[in-house]
Structure formats: structure tokens, C-alpha cells
Amino acid sequence: VQAGAPVDVEVRACGRQYPERLDDMAWENDLVGFRAYGPALQARGERGFGYDLFTKRGTAAPVLEDMYAKELDADSWKQVNELRKTDPKAADELVRTFSYHIDHGYGMDCYAVGPTLGAGVSALMVNDTIIYPWCYKTQEVLDNGPLRFTVKLEFNPLAVKGDTAVVETRLITLDAGSHLNRTAVSYSNLKESLPIVTGIVLHEPDGAVVADAAGGYMTYVDPTTGPDNGKIFMGAAFPAVVKEAK
């Protein structure tokens, strides 16, 4: 064995919390980006739970830092707010020049989440009712590149049947070259075994949906938030036995 120098590796997986955007936890690799909603959003009374996602194209390099910086630029929004007083149409056009909801050549956020499971999140289910803990409470980044991103999210205690302080912990890993997160979900203070549901929100109920319990996967073609954005091919796969898929 000989001593050597490590080879530099380009960053292909990374992420961080964005306190400047209501505590978003956002992460990406060379193919796709995601975010989970944080405590500052919940403090405003909003309810977000499922993953949001960012499409990427034309680059393998990280883009979320740039997307967030442009979306949140105070000077840009100052110009927009001034324009809205006299020319709302021009103000809207200005927003389109920097918004991450518009593709500027490297991808965008054209996915809608709201109070749903979003892009393939899991939750407890009681009597056909999904139990949402809503936004995460704490976060800890365990791996931050260059080829793997891992974050541990812990959620607020919630009441589940007779248990009053059930806490979800979610360990999320995204590797370079993968379109899919690997997620391990656990619950503390839960005395009774309960079903866990994993879902993808259907923005177009009559769209192309495949749910295969025997095969352990489900897929969905999402129409995105606008007709000019194309479609997003969603999916989830399960290493454990799936009892029911619908």
C-alpha cells in the first residue's frame, strides 16, 4: 500500500436547509432535486408534508443554490412590487425572468404538493385516514456530497389512536446517478403496529397510473403545473412486501 493524494470529484449530490425560504430542506443530484417543508412554514399556519421536486436538464452540476438565490433576491422583488403599482403585466413578466417556476435552461419547480404525500412520501394510516405530521421539526445533514446526500428529519409529536407522542424520523439518501431517494422511516412511542401508506399525489386522476403490489412498485405520469412544462414520470419501489396497491 502506497500513500497517495485523493482525486478531486465534482459535486453531484448536495443540499442544505434554506432558512431564507421558510426552512426548506432542499437537496439534489445530477438528475433531479427535492425539498421538504420546514418549521418556519408550519409556524405561518401552512401545511406541507410530501416532497416537492425540481426537474433538471442540460447540466449535471448543482443548481438549487442559484435557483433559490434568484427566486429570493430582494432587489428583484422590490422592482416587481413597484411595477405592480402601475403595470401588473410588466411585473408578471419580470417575475418570469427569475422565478424557479420557469425553466431558464437548467430545470424548474413545476410540481404542486400542498397537504398531500407529494412525490412518494410515507405516512401512518388509521381507518383509511392518513395521519400527517406536516412539516419537519428538526434536520441533520449526515452526508453532503460529493456523490451522496443524506439528511435525517424528525417531525413533531402527534396523537395516533391511544398514543399521544408518536414521533416520525425519516432518513433520506440521494446518490448521484439516481432519480430515486432511498428513505427509511421509523416511529417512536408507537405501541401498536399500524399500516404505512406511500403515495404520489394525483394531479390528473385519469392519468397513467400503475400500482403493482406483487411487483412492489407504483408509477404515475404527472401533468405538471402547466401545459408547456411537459410531464414528470413519478415512481416508488419497495424492498418490503406490499399488502395492497391502488
Give residue spans per PLM region.
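Short, hydrophobic/aromatic-enriched beta-strand segments in well-ordered soluble domains
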Residues: 1-5, 151-155, 236
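Short, exposed beta-strand/loop patches in secreted or surface proteins that constitute
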Residues: 17-18, 25-27, 133, 137-144, ...
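Active-site cradle of extracellular carbohydrate-active enzymes
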Residues: 111-157
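Acidic, contiguous internal or C-terminal segments within carbohydrate-active enzymes
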Residues: 140-144, 149-194
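Polysaccharide-binding surfaces and accessory modules of carbohydrate-active proteins
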Residues: 189-245
